[in-house]
Amino acid sequence: MKKITKTLSLGFILFLLSSAPFSLNAEIKLPVIFSDNMVLQQQTDAAIWGWANPNTPVRVTTSWDRKSYTAKSDGEGRWKLKVKTPAAGYTPYTITISDGKSVTLQNILIGEIW
């Protein structure tokens, strides 16, 4: 019984470590829900979050209004901010997230999310 418990504990710890967002090169990391071809809720303050180096300024720029939003990552590298979204439409947009290195999400649509 102890061997099974140790094996399950070790497997769980390895799973947690492999799913944690580690970065050695100052690159923005985003949860899998943020990607190319996503849809954001129209006319709201949409939350965007991720990981960067600890205590680093992060800038998010949206193409629909060319506005930049800023946040600072905490001591563990986590950051979060909200962006205003426009009315629904068929125009694809981009979101660029940067902490010195940029990540651009493309083909973002705005609409109703149920």
Residue spans for each PLM region:
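Non-catalytic, glycine-rich low-complexity segments
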Residues: N25-P54, I108-W114
